[in-house]
Amino acid sequence: MKFGMYYNKETIGDVLLVIYKSDVIPAYVKQRNDIVALFDKDNEIVGYNFLNISNSMKIKAHGQIPICSHQVIDILNCMLKNASFPLLDYLDESGFKVGQIVEMEEHPDSDHLHILKVDIKKDRLLNIVCGSFNAKVGLKAVVATENCFMPSGKQIIPEEVMGVFSEGMLCSGRELNIDGYENKKGLYILDDSYNVGDDFYTLY
């Protein structure tokens, strides 16, 4: 199951957050040792809070951790196993793909939305509704794919946008929390050194 992982000691303390469902308010929690497990009303895991995590590992992140080593997951799973909580899958892929716009048409019911066909080297093109002013055919950008987690904690869920199905999101530098892009609008444009279909965070 996909999850988001976050750590920022300055803002939330020495706590590693793991989020499975960003749109679900936990119904109850269970704490065992330094792990707080959050559950929904159906008794399914919503996420984990690993307290005092620096006692177990050193983390340099200041926000989202899009991918991490098997060693990190193995340490966390050892802690979860000792607390009798469900284990984590390896976080080998971030869900942020290098994509290229191959088709573009204007949304019939909007003066700024575009309907895009985006290639991420999947078995088919993705249909994505996008409002960025600099979107154009041929442009390479970062695609947040289905169920991946943004730096903000938001999970990307396929949905209809003004009547048109959208199954992902093309990202701005600000949405990706890239330094220097805090106040810049428009898609974060990738050059030809990026290959379509690659994981953005194995390259960035």
State what each model feature region is.
Residues 1-204:
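Phosphate-backbone binding interfaces of nucleic-acid-interacting proteins
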